Swiss-Prot record:
UniProt xrefs under InterPro entries: DNA_mismatch_repair_MutS, DNA_mismatch_repair_MutS-lik_N, DNA_mismatch_repair_MutS/MSH, DNA_mismatch_repair_MutS_C, DNA_mismatch_repair_MutS_clamp, DNA_mismatch_repair_MutS_core, DNA_mismatch_repair_MutS_N, DNA_mismatch_repair_MutS_sf
Record lineage: Bacteria, Bacillati, Bacillota, Bacilli, Bacillales
Annotated Pfam families: MutS_I (PF01624), MutS_II (PF05188), MutS_III (PF05192), MutS_IV (PF05190), MutS_V (PF00488)
Similarity remark: Belongs to the DNA mismatch repair MutS family.
Protein name, entry field: DNA mismatch repair protein MutS
Residues where ATP binds: 607-614
Alphabetized PROSITE patterns for the sequence: DNA_MISMATCH_REPAIR_2
Compositionally biased intervals (Basic and acidic residues): 845-855
PANTHER family per UniProt: DNA MISMATCH REPAIR PROTEIN MSH1, MITOCHONDRIAL (PTHR11361:SF34), DNA MISMATCH REPAIR PROTEIN MUTS FAMILY MEMBER (PTHR11361)
Alphabetical list of CDD domains matching this protein: ABC_MutS1
SMART domains from the UniProt entry: MUTSac, MUTSd
């Protein structure tokens, strides 16, 4: 390192502590980057890569950005998942001896960004910290640096459960210890696309102990300690706005796994990953940024406590029924800025005068809001506003201190009102009168010289001057002015009198700017005292905003208040998919009932493609979520239980698990539901088994249906193209066939989008192909092939084999191999015996025929089957073993 110049040596020393970040190294008016940072930054930011002499034999790669434009470049890098260490000059270069002293003043990361275009005003920017313990449990702590919010929870489930909870936070960055499992880190980065950071310190930092007073569990304290230590190490500034840590328990909320949330498009669409077109987009009628953030948090964690849900519903009903109250509240909320993030900026010391003006305007609305809510005869409303302080003294302070139209910068003056500070008023008097004198001098000199174009101007280099065009120089009295500067078309002069006034004016103006800055920073410290009250107020206003948002959308879209029941029954009359209905924008939407009494657990749904099966299934899930976040629902009547979990497998999700096939994704999602669902869960399976051969798919579909029906008892919508499965209605007493109706008119299919009882009689696949405008010749050929296939043998679903519950694992009997042969009912067609296919694809002979002798290969496979311990295998392992044996039999 000694071969480099002292400045480059200094750079390398600082860089050694920030190997995983771009180092923005301040040199004068630029932030410079060197070596690999420069090469990579030039590529990512599309800026010029140059080089400089650094003392070594080879030139050093270098690139840089102007300091005043650095914010934009830093945002670009952080948006791409990088970290940026900002290294500033911490001493005056004019007085420095040797190399100017420099220090990193902040490490900016995806989870610690405070402002900029990467921070959506209606989304939290959570930083997560995950701690793994020897007993297999995890503690997850989260902090939103922009709002000061802190949460922590203990997780004891699988890695998938951990992923679900981290996903629910929306975190872009997660902090772990340096020994954290690499496999688990890979899942976080691949599935959730997160930036990984490391922090080994877990003790609560000095000065922050008061934030964990309500946290007693050592595991939770460790997770919070890791989080706080990382924040302090990276931010290096005041954290006065951090709020007390809130403990929450995941079993207090409905569980919806990561893939189900995406399938249902709760907060973003599958295709575009955008909010528009999601349920959140429809429900978001909030008027404040903080209300928008709370709405998203509620949607990520629907409630499962009936009483809490009903409290919200009653409050929404109050707003629905009182139009004037609702509209008045909305008008006031429009004037409320982001109190949470304003408080954060105050604490961080980067609040400006305009921010404080926004704070004052917000606080002016608060007394009327609190008074209106206090008049409601509602226990929830009374509890909500209890302890809310309108901060009227702060409103008064800001009202008499901050100008109505202050500049963005706090270093340019013109911030503080007249009358706030006596000394400032005196300086302003001198400055103002001095400028009046300058204007009078200009008029007097014009009169004396007769030069109408004479003017008095000012610049920072020469100060005040008298400017005369060259055409008028001859009119000047000789010796009146002292020449100061020559321009192309004019001459500039000064006088002793002008210089005297200039000194008085400039001294006053300099003192004004400095005093205003000092007064503003003192004011900012006074505002800091109110941060806890502002944060409490923000929570109250956010919650009111979400509730009025629910009321507004419910009124606009004609939603109804759901009735919650402790019974396991669903009664939805004229239910609609809220987002599809909205997107149709006035076109007729066909509503559908969903009526599942306590003794009805499974709807087996058949019908053609494009008929609306998936929409109907999603519709039920969205109605359920809306109900349990406290919103009215799209129906004319709704009676619903409180579900503990929602599981889905509904198309378009094949890319969600990296590197997995469609069929594997199906099986993994099916396994998740089967392993975790309870009788209080909702399961939505769309076309399970489509990713493999017909017989395998049908076998698995039947087995899954039977297992859910017999062993779980969850309310389930199961759509299928295997029409043969509809006979299960005869043997499963809590299963009912329903179908989406369609009719043919003039050889073309017309989808009615109406759910009706019974099984569908046709799939209309070729008609759908016609709608897609496939070539006529291809359609004609498909019809010929279909006619041939329909004339062939019929597939018969095997009878169920009753097995005791303890003998079953996840996939029930039709695919469980036993030593005794399974009797398969025979069907006769045209008085001829029809041979049937078993679930292994091997042809079974009619009972009237003698069983053929097994060859050596078949005997070997049978021996292997007998040795399989099915009770010690997962469904996926059983399926893989089945494929292996089948493949072995098929080899010639």
């Amino acid at each position: 390192m000694t071969q480099y110049t002292p400045m480059i040596q200094q750079y390398l020393k600082v860089k050694a502590d920030y190997q995983d970040a771009f180092l923005f190294f301040r040199l004068g008016d630029f932030y410079e980057m060197f070596f690999e940072d420069a090469v990579k930054a030039a590529h990512e930011l599309e800026i010029t890569l140059t080089s400089r002499d650094g003392g070594s034999s080879e030139r050093i790669p270098m690139c840089g950005v102007p300091y005043h434009a650095a914010k934009n470049y830093i945002e670009q890098l952080v948006e791409k998942g990088y970290k940026v260490a900002v290294c500033e000059q911490v001493e005056d270069p004019k007085t420095a001896k040797g190399v100017v002293r420099r220090e990193v003043v902040q490490l900016i990361t995806p989870g610690t960004m405070m402002e900029g275009r990467t921070i959506d005003e209606k989304e939290n920017n959570f930083l997560a910290a995950l701690t793994h313990f020897e007993d297999g449990s995890y503690a997850l702590a989260c902090n939103d640096l922009t709002t000061g919010q802190n949460t922590v929870t203990l997780l004891t489930g699988s890695v998938e459960d951990i992923l679900l909870e981290v996903y629910a936070t929306g975190s872009k960055e997660i902090v772990v210890d340096s020994s954290f499992s690499k496999d688990e880190l890979n899942k976080l980065t691949e599935t959730l696309k997160m930036t990984i950071s490391y922090e080994d310190a877990t003790a609560i930092p000095e000065g922050l102990e008061h934030l964990v007073k309500n946290v007693s569990q050592a595991k939770l304290i460790k997770a919070v300690g890791r989080l706080f230590n990382y924040v302090i190490r990276t931010q290096k500034r005041s954290l006065d706005h951090l709020q007390p840590v809130e403990i929450y328990y995941t079993n207090q909320f409905m569980k919806i796994d990561v893939h189900s949330k995406r399938n249902l498009e709760l907060t973003e669409t599958l295709r575009t990953k955008e909010k528009t077109g999601s349920l959140l987009w429809l429900l978001d009628k909030t008027k404040t940024a903080m209300g928008g953030r709370m709405l998203k948090q509620w949607m990520e964690r629907p409630l499962i406590q009936k009483e809490r849900i009903e409290e919200r519903l009653e409050m929404v009903e109050t707003f629905v029924n009182d139009y004037f109250l609702r509209e008045d509240l909305k008008e006031k909320l429009k004037e409320v800025y982001d109190l949470e993030r304003l408080a954060g900026k105050v604490a961080f010391g980067n609040v400006n005068a305009r921010d404080l003006l926004q704070l004052r305007r917000s606080l002016l609305q608060v007394p009327a809001i609190l008074e209106a809510i206090s008049l409601l005869d509602n226990a929830y409303a009374a509890r909500l506003i209890q302890g809310a302080d309108p901060c009227e003294s702060l409103t008064e302070l800001l009202g008499r201190s901050i100008q109505e139209n202050p500049p963005l910068s706090i270093k340019d003056g013109d911030i503080i009102k007249d009358g706030y500070n006596d000394k400032l008023d005196q300086y302003r008097y001198v400055s103002k009168n001095g400028k009046t004198w300058i204007a009078e001098l200009e008029k007097r000199e014009r009169d004396i010289t007769g030069i109408k174009s004479l003017k008095i101007g000012y610049n920072r280099i020469f100060g005040y001057y008298i400017e005369v065009t060259k055409a008028n120089l001859g009119a000047l009295p000789e010796g009146r002015y002292e020449r100061k500067q020559t321009l192309a078309n004019a001459e500039r002069f000064i006088t002793d009198e002008l210089k005297e006034k200039e000194t008085l004016i400039l001294e006053a103006e300099e003192k004004i700017v400095q005093l205003e800055y000092d007064l503003f920073t003192a004011l900012r410290e006074e505002v800091k005292v109110f941060i806890p009250k502002l944060q409490h107020l923000a929570k109250v206003i956010s919650e009111l905003d979400v509730l009025q948002s629910f009321a507004t959308v419910s009124e606009e879209e004609q939603f109804v208040k759901p009735v919650l029941t402790t019974k396991r029954e669903i009664f939805i009359k004229d239910g609609r998919h809220p987002v599809v209905e909205k997107v149709l924008n006035g076109k007729l939407y066909v509503p559908n009932d969903c009526i599942m009494p306590e003794n009805m657990d499974v709807f087996l749904i058949t019908g053609p493609n494009m008929s609306g099966k998936s929409t109907y299934m999603r519709q039920l899930a969205l109605v359920t979520v809306m109900s349990q976040i406290g919103c009215f629902v799209p129906a004319t009547e709704a009676v619903l239980p409180v579900f503990d979990q929602i599981f889905t497998r509904i198309g378009a999700a094949d890319d969600l698990i990296s590197g997995q096939s469609t069929f594997m994704v199906e099986m993994l999602e099916a396994k998740n539901a089967i392993a975790n669902a309870s009788e209080r869960s909702l399961i939505l399976f769309d076309e399970i088994g489509r990713g493999t051969s017909t017989y395998d798919g049908m076998a698995l579909a039947q087995a899954i249906i039977e297992h859910i029906h017999d062993q779980i008892g969850a309310k389930t919508l199961f759509s299928t193209h295997y029409h043969e499965l509809t006979v299960l209605e005869d043997s499963l007493d809590q299963l009912k066939n329903v179908h989406v109706s369609a009719i043919e008119e003039n050889g073309k299919v017309v989808f009615l989008h109406k759910i009706q009882d019974g099984a569908a009689d046709k799939s209309y696949g070729i008609h759908v192909a016609q709608l897609a405008e496939l070539p006529d010749s291809l359609i004609a050929r498909a019809k010929e092939v279909l006619a041939q296939l329909e004339g062939q043998e019929e597939i018969v679903i095997p009878k169920r084999v009753e097995v005791k519950a303890q003998e079953q694992e996840v996939i029930p009997e039709p695919i469980v191999v036993k030593e005794e042969p399974i009797e398969i009912e025979e069907t006769k067609v045209d008085n001829e015996e029809e041979s049937q296919l078993s679930f292994f694809g091997a042809e079974q002979s009619s009972k009237k025929q003698d069983k053929p002798a097994l060859d050596a290969k078949e005997t070997a496979v049978l021996t292997q089957i007998k040795k399989i311990d099915l009770l010690d295998m997962t469904p996926l392992e059983a399926m893989n073993e089945l494929y292996r044996l089948q493949k072995k039999l098929k080899k010639g």
